[in-house]
Amino acid sequence: MSSTLSEGQTLIKKSLSPSKATSTNNKGHVFVEPQTPLKNSNKASTSEAALPETLKIMGPLTTPTKVLDAPSSDPWTPTSNLKMLISAASPEIRNREKERAVDSSESENSQETEQGEEVEKLHISRKDKSLGLLCYKFLARYPNYPNPALNNGISLDDVAAELHVERRRIYDIMNVLESLNMVSRLAKNRYTWHGRVKLAQTLAVLKRAGKENRYEQLMQQIRQRSQEREEREFDLDGEEKENEEMSSFEVDGDSGLADLPGADSKAASANSRKDKSLRVMSQKFVMLFLVSSPPVVSLDVAAKILIGEDHVVDQDKNKFKTKIRRLYDIANVLSSLELIKKVHVTEDKGRKPAFKWTGPEDIPSPKDLEISTTSSAPKPLESRSSVENCAKNLFSSPGTKRGFTRHHSLVKLVKSIQDDRRKINSAPSSPIKMTGDSADSDFYTTKMAHLAAICKKHLDEQSADGRPNNAVTDSSQSSKQPESTSASNHGPPGMQIPVLPAGAISYLPTKCSPIIPLLIPQHQTGGPYAVYMHPTSLRPQPTSLAVRSMTFESPVGANAKTSPATLTSNNQTNQSSSYGKEQTSPVNLKRASGEKSSVGSPSKMQRTEPKSVSPKLCEILQARLKARRGALTSNRPSARALHLEFSKPSESQPTVQTGTASLEHSLETFLEKEEKSQTSDNEAGLTPVRQPHSQPQKLSAPFQDMVLPSGPIHTETLIPAGYLIPISQQSIVNFREPQCSNESSKASTPTYNIYHTPTAGSRPAFPQEVTPTRLPLHRIPPISPFPSHGHRLHSPSPAILNFTLQNLGLIPGSVTPNPHTPEQSSSLQSPHPGLPHQGMIFVKPMSPARALQQTSIHGQPVTLISIPQALVTTPKGGQAFQQSFFHTPVSFPTVNTTAPKKIYIPQRKLDVSPEEI
């Protein structure tokens, strides 16, 4: 601090010395500095040489005079010294302050100049940015009729920069031009210029749309209402009526929007944003000029029609004024295009702004313009791709972006598809249980709705395997369709089954159908089959010399000469009296509806006069059959078919001789007749028939051991008219019946249960018990029409079989049989062993494990199980009348009983087991 003060004092002394000198000079007192003698001459010479220089600088060397009593302006105080010190120590601070002052002054001047320039700019842009002037400048950049071969693209960014305006102002111009098809949108901020090339066509379309929307009538009504409103300003009722009328004439967006390029069909309603866009309002505004008779439209009328918010004027005036400004923008652009001009309309309250149409007045129809443009206009689009040429409207342009609109119905379609897919995905998908043969072979479902389709599919697969159907007679070739309806029936109950040569099982019906029956060939899969047999009540009257026989074919050579037994009908002299009795018996009812269905069926052959058939005709048919048989036996594979052969009685063939016994023939009588036929079997080279070693009277279901010949099997297949229905292994169930009081010595073994269809009779049928094993079976006599034990049966159920057979036309929908007398009902209790008069046959191929190769039918013997159907009977004594009810079959509880004596039955044989009722 001391050093600083000393320096400050020296500076003060230096600064004060010149002031003292001046003061002394002014007063005349001069101070002279004393001179000292020079010791050295050298020094003196040196000082003398430097003296003139110092004189020049310091002036004359005179001693200053001392100023006496000189008053000081500032007192010497510590504060003054401090001020002097601060001012001397901070010269740079003073410079900075001066610089800041200069900068602030310059900035103020610059701000004033900038504000002035901005004011000038705002004043200029307000004038230059008017939409009409901008539209004039914009149209001056492009020709009215451009060359389509050149690039006529427009970039809004470049145009806004060149015109020194905002891009939003250019958007207003482009929307109005796009509504008139003078430009088309290519991309964002990219447009294509078309000019006035399509202006006439656009105006024609707009004029047609305006007429369709009744704009002219609407304008007249608005003018009339406005005049009435002026007269009744204070009438509230008049205003309400006006609002109602206005609402009835409001135009929605779809009708007001013309089908123009860029006029998107998605502009839906009058309240939508798209409908009130500048482009759509511009189209409607032009429509008003084109349809009005004096082409002058006031702005308020146009606002009421286009904006459609006249009733909201009092509620929101600012909103309505904003939309009025949009109409002004449209009018300014149209004025720049020289289509309209502004005028004033004088009314009662004064002048109102209006616009008059100055554009083309004679506008042709759109069709004429289309014809002229297609014939004369150049075609620059031919070189472009087909996608670009596919436009959604009349005004397609080269290079424009195509916008395809999704129709609203597609949205509903997509929703419905999604709902269906959701239902399918949410449906239960439990696996199907497949057991036994169903997993290995063709699986047949147990559902009723699919059984008929599965049977048809099975037949189609058989035909697709390349196995040709076995040919039948010439008369049966025209009737190969499997439409054997209820007219294809067979014999009555009590008929016998004699053993015939050539391994053919011949059924001798007394009442035969004149129609040729046909059994559908089935695919040989080893599975069981159910053969449906038609009821007696639907069978037609028999014809003479008609014989049906059944066999299962096997490939034989052309030298097969054996033929099935030819049997005569009941009009021959050697026919048994029992059959004659059966023919005249009232049990054999006349057909009810079979004859009608057979007459109208073109796929069947009918003989009009059955009794007039002569043996000569039968010989001709038999000769033709034999001639065709020799040609077809070599190339026919093993398939099952049904053939009909007409023949006369042969002397070499044995005839069946029966007495006048009743229908209650015993099995012994039947076996005795079979022994008589063994002689003919030996002559034909057949294996003798083996009788079962048991008492047939004790068997409820007797069996017949039918051994087929060891030689070639005959190719003729004859069976009573029926159908083979494939049955899966699920339908084969095992059950045991409880022991009966009167049949306690009989045992129950696993059996196959087949149930008849409840269509022919009114009483419930009972299960048929047949087994291919060596154990006999017994049956409990029925106590009540309701089964006391359930049957376990998976497939097929009687309802399924009824459904399938009725759909295929095999059985009628409902049959009401005629009642019988007690004598007639008693005759049905024990029919003769043979094919029953009605019911179903269950065909079960047996296992080919045994070595009886001569009995195999393509390696698989069959077992015929017939289920008769009962008819309505008159109750005897105190028996209650039994009604027919359908019960779902379920399984019986098993009961172990005493097994009777076993009967040896060869496995490879053909067993026919009737049932006693």
UniProtKB/Swiss-Prot annotation:
It comes from the Eukaryota. Residues 126-195, 273-359 bind DNA. GO terms for biological process: cell cycle comprising mitosis without cytokinesis; chorionic trophoblast cell differentiation; hepatocyte differentiation; lymphangiogenesis; motor neuron axon guidance; negative regulation of cytokinesis; negative regulation of DNA-templated transcription; negative regulation of transcription by RNA polymerase II. Disruption phenotype: Embryos lacking both e2f7 and e2f8 contain multiple intersegmental arteries that completely fail to migrate from the dorsal aorta. Gross morphology of these embryos and initial formation of main axial vessels are unaltered. Residues 93-103 have a biased composition (Basic and acidic residues). Residues 105-117, 233-252 have a biased composition (Acidic residues). Pfam families: E2F_TDP. Keywords: Activator, Cell cycle, DNA-binding, Nucleus, Repressor, Transcription, Transcription regulation. Residues 16-27, 37-48, 371-386, 595-605, 815-830 have a biased composition (Polar residues). One of its GO terms (cellular component) is RNA polymerase II transcription regulator complex. InterPro entries: E2F, E2F_WHTH_DNA-bd_dom, WH-like_DNA-bd_sf, WH_DNA-bd_sf. Residues 1-122, 221-252, 353-386, 461-497, 556-615, 671-698, 813-834 are annotated as: Disordered. Its main location: nucleus. One of its GO terms (molecular function) is RNA polymerase II cis-regulatory region sequence-specific DNA binding. Residues 475-488, 568-578 have a biased composition (Low complexity). The keyword Cell membrane does not apply. It is found in: Nucleus. Homodimer and heterodimer: mainly forms homodimers and, to a lesser extent, heterodimers with e2f7. Belongs to the E2F/DP family. Atypical E2F transcription factor that participates in various processes such as angiogenesis and polyploidization of specialized cells. Mainly acts as a transcription repressor that binds DNA independently of DP proteins and specifically recognizes the E2 recognition site 5'-TTTC[CG]CGC-3'. Directly represses transcription of classical E2F transcription factors such as e2f1. Acts as a regulator of S-phase by recognizing and binding the E2-related site 5'-TTCCCGCC-3' and mediating repression of G1/S-regulated genes. In contrast to classical members of the E2F transcription factor, atypical members contain 2 DNA-binding domains and regulate transcription in a DP-independent manner. Both DNA-binding domains are required for DNA-binding and are proposed to form an intramolecular structure that is similar to the winged helix structure of the E2F-DP heterodimer. This is Transcription factor E2F8. It comes from Danio rerio.
